Regions:
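Glycine-centered flexibility sites
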Residues: 19, 27, 60, 74-76, ...
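The canonical Cys-X-X-Cys-His
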Residues: 19, 25-35, 83, 118, ...
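A structural feature that tracks compact, well-ordered secondary-structure segments
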Residues: 70-81, 85-91, 104-107, 119-124
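Short, solvent-exposed loop/turn elements at domain surfaces
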Residues: 30, 38-40, 74-77
Length: 155
């Protein structure tokens, strides 16, 4: 058998506090908290998923998903190892890759203790029932406010 991706980190206050700190400095709320892009983050739904999508030319529109432990709309049905794979490998439980805007490459270098702390913190949050729109393919019209990401043209 293979070793688990997640260390056996008990959901103790120190691990949760470390995870909270890392989530804050990583700016996870920027893309995953409703209202953030309108300058009025809804802290009652902290990390509950964004209603604003990012349009990436040729790829479609992606929304920051719900990171709370809600079983229907968040990470509640994900295992700890699946959360770690998303954070450090950019891979969803069904094998699809996460949206290109997710900075998993940076998180790939987190220590096992740090990623375990993030998982413990996300598990400690109140569940927020909030289904985000999309994703929408390149030819699909989005049903939400969209921020366009336009790469510089090659010269």
């Amino acid at each position: 058998t293979t070793a688990p991706l997640v260390p056996a980190v008990a959901a103790d206050p120190a691990a949760i506090a470390r995870g909270k700190y890392l989530v804050a400095i990583a700016g996870c709320n920027d893309c995953h908290t409703p209202g953030y892009f309108f300058g009025k983050p809804d802290m009652a739904r902290f990390l509950g998923g964004s209603e604003v999508g990012f349009e990436i030319p040729g790829l479609g529109v992606f929304h920051g998903p719900n990171l709370t432990p809600d079983k229907a709309t968040g990470l509640g049905d994900w295992t700890d190892a699946e959360i770690v794979a998303a954070l450090q490998k950019g891979q969803r439980p069904d094998g699809r890759v996460l949206a290109p805007i997710m900075p998993w490459h940076a998180f790939a270098h987190l220590t096992k203790q740090d990623v375990g702390g993030i998982v413990a913190y996300l598990r400690s949050l109140p569940a927020v029932a909030h289904k985000v729109p999309g994703p929408f393919g390149p030819a699909e019209p989005p049903t939400s406010f969209v921020m366009k990401i336009v790469p510089p043209s090659a010269k």
